[in-house]
Amino acid sequence: MNKIVVLTGPTASGKSSLSIQMAQRLNGEIVSADSMQIYRNLDVGTAKVTKEEQNIVPHHLIDIVDLTANYSVGDFIIAADKVIADIISRGKLPIIVGGTGLYVKALLGFQELEYAASDTEEVHKLNAYELDKLVVELKSLDINRAQKVDLKNKQRVIRAIQIAKYGKKDAKLTQRPKYDALVIGLDWPRELLYERINHRVTQMVQDGVLKEAQTILDAGGEKLQSGKAIGYKEFFPYLRDQVTLDKAINQLQQDSRRYAKRQLTYLRHQIPGLVWLKGQTAELRLTEMIEGWLSLK
């Protein structure tokens, strides 16, 4: 199997900066495994690497869809497999970087998924319908599938309708390892991680996250997949003059800390073979660890 390196961990753990250093030293290219960095023009709230950083090392699967688009795990796997194959064909090392645990798990082959390729135009049409009507349509198409889907989650109902309509596009991601992967997680003492998260949120406000949140709100707000993300939805009440900015900031800090805790729990229980490194000293050990692993046949 082809070798890849995966660098994961909770939000604000330092994955992006460390991955750039790794890629420079190991002749690698970075493949984002972040479910929000796929969106164009959402840079601050997603903690996306800068254009200058992207010029230092090639980054893939960043800025690939509009902020109104839906994007599934299946879409990610299709795109990531193609990018990884291309990187390997050019003699470089694919370095997968991101904290979206389901993306990582599925890419490694430990998650069986059923998916249909996204049809953006149809998704827009389906989004215009009320949830009740979508549920009725899904039940009429495939009652068995309807019984397995969270019927209160509009996006999952829409995805189920797509799969039910286009059975020929269904596919199974087999539950077996697809790559020879070294999977590394960055771990921080909770107090330090929370400090980093709180600081990041403050910096995001200074860097213009409110402008991005307003753009999402104008395009549909919570109705959009991008509008449900931590980092933007917390500012919608402020932009609607319902709460103060301080309250919105505090809410985002709290939501981000809770999200980090969930990320850690998921990664520890769902990703087989993950090796944890202390975030404070990971840079000192990482390159040597990877070089030793790459030398193994």
From Swiss-Prot:
Substrate binds at residues 11-16. Its EC number is 2.5.1.75. It holds the Pfam family IPPT. Residues 34-37, 155-159 are annotated as: Interaction with substrate tRNA. Keywords: ATP-binding, Magnesium, Nucleotide-binding, Transferase, tRNA processing. GO terms for biological process: tRNA modification. The keyword Signal does not apply. NCBIfam families: miaA (TIGR00174). This is tRNA dimethylallyltransferase. The gene is miaA.
